[in-house]
Each structure stands twice: as C-alpha cells, then as structure tokens.
C-alpha cells in the first residue's frame, strides 16, 4: 500500500528530472489529478475532456466529467422548467442540469432541504439532502451538528453553478 502511494510522486520526479513526456494510463481519478499536467478523460473510447486537472475539476465540459472527477462527485440536479425538479428553487438559467461541487454548498441558506443521511469523516461531514425530487450532497466541517431527518437551509453562490444541456454538454 505504501509503495502504491509513493509511486506517483516518484514517477513525477523522474519525469521532471529527465524532461520527457510521459503518458500514464490509470482508472484512478485521484492519481491522474495529482500526477498530471494534462488529463485526457475517456468515456467508452471517446474523449470527454482534455484539460489541466484544475480546469477539469473547476470547469467540466460534460456531466460525465462533472460526475467522474471529485469525491464526492459534483451534484447534478435535474431542472424542470426553470426550477430544480420537484421544488420551487430557481435554477438560475435555462438548462437541463444544474451542477455544483459539494464543498460549494453552504448550510444556513435560502434553499429548504431535508437531511436524508450523513457520513461523518472526522474533519469533514458529508450530508445528503433532499431538495424537491433531487438529492444534493454537501461537504461541510465535521463539527456541523446535523442528523438524518433534520430540516436545513442550503445556499450556493451563482458563480459556482454549472449548467448543462439535455445531452450533458456544458453551457457557456
């Protein structure tokens, strides 16, 4: 296990020292994100996105990229009309999917939600919350006092919202 953790660092140092281009294939997203200058994300043999790790995480080109990169994955909420499916919460713009990273969602906001389950991870707490017909995952501090069944308010800045069309492509 320790060798598996040290190998990406060793390979990166070797690549920089030799100055050669290295193509490294992995199914481990964390490994790819931590080692790469550029990531080519494939889905069934098709390139979903080719970008720096930071761009891949911050500006996913598709819902596949959004849901594949990150732990927990980006929230992808269905939009019906101009609202999050089954709710009165405005989606912010015309789209089919609204996405936001779990760490971009904050507690104590305008969006009513019900905590359906929690995962206590020590420093972090992952809360799964029902918003209308959708489930929204929130990553917050492990000190947060939440319990399944509790009613909470959620919020996110418009700048962290990602919008995707019906085919899963990012809208500009």
Residue ranges of model-derived segments:
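Short, Lys/Arg- and Gly-enriched loop/turn segments at beta-strand edges
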Residues: 159-167
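Generic structural signal for well-ordered beta-strand positions
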Residues: 48, 116, 171-172
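Hydrophobic beta-strand signal
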Residues: 40, 97-99, 153
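Detector for glycine-centered tight turns/loop "hinges" at secondary-structure junctions
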Residues: 86-88, 166-169
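ATPase nucleotide-binding modules
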Residues: 54, 58-116, 121, 125-146
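ABC ATPase nucleotide-binding domains
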Residues: 1-61
């Amino acid at each position: 296990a320790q060798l598996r953790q040290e190998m990406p660092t060793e390979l990166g140092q070797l690549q920089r020292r030799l100055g050669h281009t290295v193509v490294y294939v992995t199914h481990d997203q964390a490994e790819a994100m931590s080692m790469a200058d550029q990531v080519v994300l494939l889905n069934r043999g098709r390139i979903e996105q080719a970008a720096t790790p930071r761009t891949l995480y911050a500006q996913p080109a598709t819902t596949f990229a959004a849901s594949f990169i990150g732990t927990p994955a980006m929230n992808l909420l269905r939009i019906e009309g101009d609202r999050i499916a089954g709710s009165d919460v405005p989606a912010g713009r015309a789209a089919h999917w609204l996405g936001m990273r779990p760490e971009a969602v904050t507690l104590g906001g305008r969006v009513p939600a019900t905590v359906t389950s929690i995962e206590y991870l020590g420093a972090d707490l992952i809360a799964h919350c029902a918003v209308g017909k959708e489930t929204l995952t929130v990553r917050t501090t492990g000190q947060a006092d939440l319990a399944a069944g509790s009613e909470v308010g959620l919020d996110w800045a418009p700048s962290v919202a990602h919008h995707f069309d019906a085919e899963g492509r990012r809208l500009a």
